[in-house]
């Protein structure tokens, strides 16, 4: 019997860098959501752990011991076996938590296959800062180094367009370029948004503190943001340390789709582009 788990894209709608610990880890305050765009993990019983990778974004990925999917399997039960397959649809190292989402989906699927309890957030954190929030992919406020997760007020329905200009961004270099690392967090109590225009108006007053150094490293990110805004996005921003950007649209089933197809895929065929809804 095969068990399947979806690994949705993780989007940082806000990302405030609020400090840096003595061990070098940066402190964040981020509003995180997920989209119905993502990778798929399938697991089935086997005597040993194996990993097969396919899909349109599988190029450059290898089933090596340091692959997050295999690390997740070893973390959960190093003595157990399973045949794992990963269908990769999200670009690698693109700021939307693809590897972390894959690891989290692997933990969920293998826990079900092996009849084990899901790992704690503390255990998941050993795989990466984004893995705990991806373990149970619902809208959340992520603070600290990714170890402090909390609920947020209900979000209005919205569709989303994700765009990656196919450039690499060095996350360590982006953090290193930050001149000020002790910035203001979001307000302790988040508002209750009545509708999408009110929510996007609030987002416009928030920040992604990594956007400026990421754009300095890869100026094409600014072109992506401008393309999304010109296409009518109610709000456009960069997720994580880039280079993937997002545009938010009404949940009418056609605005995001038409933007993704007509404006971005035709005007910029070299960019990766996907559309869907925020979960």
Curated annotation (Swiss-Prot):
Database matches in Gene3D superfamilies: 3.30.230.10, GHMP kinase, C-terminal domain
Residues binding ATP: 91-101
GO annotation terms (biological process): isopentenyl diphosphate biosynthetic process, methylerythritol 4-phosphate pathway; terpenoid biosynthetic process
Active site positions: 10, 130
InterPro entries assigned to the protein according to its UniProt record, in alphabetical order: GHMP_kinase_C_dom, GHMP_kinase_C_sf, GHMP_kinase_N_dom, IspE, Ribosomal_Su5_D2-typ_SF, Ribsml_uS5_D2-typ_fold_subgr
Reactions mediated catalytically: 4-CDP-2-C-methyl-D-erythritol + ATP = 4-CDP-2-C-methyl-D-erythritol 2-phosphate + ADP + H(+)
Keyword Oxidoreductase on entry: no
Pathway as given in its UniProt record: Isoprenoid biosynthesis; isopentenyl diphosphate biosynthesis via DXP pathway; isopentenyl diphosphate from 1-deoxy-D-xylulose 5-phosphate: step 3/6
Assigned keywords, A-Z: ATP-binding, Isoprene biosynthesis, Kinase, Nucleotide-binding, Transferase
EC number(s) given by UniProt: 2.7.1.148
Disulfide bonds: none
Family statement: Belongs to the GHMP kinase family. IspE subfamily.
NCBIfam families associated with the record: ispE, PRK14608.1
Role: Catalyzes the phosphorylation of the position 2 hydroxy group of 4-diphosphocytidyl-2C-methyl-D-erythritol.
Listed name of the protein: 4-diphosphocytidyl-2-C-methyl-D-erythritol kinase
């Amino acid at each position: 019997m095969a068990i399947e788990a979806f690994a949705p894209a993780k989007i940082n709608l806000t990302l405030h860098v609020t400090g840096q610990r003595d061990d070098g880890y940066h402190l964040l305050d981020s509003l995180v959501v997920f989209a119905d765009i993502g990778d798929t993990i399938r697991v089935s019983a086997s005597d040993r752990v194996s990993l097969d990778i396919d899909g349109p974004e599988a190029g450059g990925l290898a089933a090596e011991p340091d692959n997050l999917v295999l690390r997740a399997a070893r973390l959960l039960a190093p003595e157990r076996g399973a045949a794992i397959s990963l269908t990769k649809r999200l670009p690698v190292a693109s700021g939307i938590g693809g590897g972390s989402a894959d690891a989290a989906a692997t933990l969920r699927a293998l826990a079900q296959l092996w009849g084990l309890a899901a790992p704690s957030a503390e255990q998941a954190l050993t795989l990466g800062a984004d893995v705990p929030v991806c373990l149970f992919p619902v809208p959340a406020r992520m603070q600290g180094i990714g170890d402090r997760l909390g609920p947020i007020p209900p979000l209005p329905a919205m569709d989303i367009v994700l765009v990656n200009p196919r450039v690499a961004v060095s996350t360590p270099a982006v953090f290193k370029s930050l001149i000020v690392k002790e910035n203001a967090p979001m307000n302790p109590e988040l508002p209750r948004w009545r509708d999408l225009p009110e929510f996007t108006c609030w987002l416009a007053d928030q920040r992604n503190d990594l956007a400026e150094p990421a754009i300095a490293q890869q100026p094409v990110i600014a072109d992506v943001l401008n393309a999304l805004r010109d296409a009518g996005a109610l709000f456009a921003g960069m997720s994580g340390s880039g280079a993937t950007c997002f545009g938010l649209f009404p949940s009418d089933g056609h605005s995001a789709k038409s933007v993704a197809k007509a404006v971005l895929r035709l005007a910029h065929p070299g960019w990766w582009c996907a559309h869907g809804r925020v979960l």
